[in-house]
């Protein structure tokens, strides 16, 4: 059994796109896809899918989010107001938290 990689972002993180057609846009992470090294971000990388008519449903053009490679997003720090790198620190109780490298703000509460 092959497990996916550990990624620097988690579900519900606020991220900013650093490259591509949606550069400088921010959004909330909806889903993590470790096997594809990708993330789904709310309102980012919108694509159109043409669906066939099925039974009583008519065909339509549906807009939805597509996967973005995890290297194209960075965590957005609300305190700094910028995209930042993170560091993992261990608290006294043994819990690991992600910390902003620039200001020291903890992302995992």
From Swiss-Prot:
Top-level taxon of origin: Bacteria
Record keyword Cell membrane present: no
GO terms, biological process: translation
One Gene Ontology molecular-function label: structural constituent of ribosome
Gene3D superfamilies per the UniProt record, alphabetical: 2.30.30.30
Xref: CDD domains: KOW_RPL26
The entry's keywords: Ribonucleoprotein, Ribosomal protein, RNA-binding, rRNA-binding
Membrane-spanning segments: none
A single cellular component GO annotation: ribonucleoprotein complex
Family per record: Belongs to the universal ribosomal protein uL24 family.
Role description: One of two assembly initiator proteins, it binds directly to the 5'-end of the 23S rRNA, where it nucleates assembly of the 50S subunit. One of the proteins that surrounds the polypeptide exit tunnel on the outside of the subunit.
Subunit composition and interactions: Part of the 50S ribosomal subunit.
Protein name per its UniProtKB record: Large ribosomal subunit protein uL24
Organism of provenance: Geotalea uraniireducens (strain Rf4)
Gene that specifies this protein: rplX
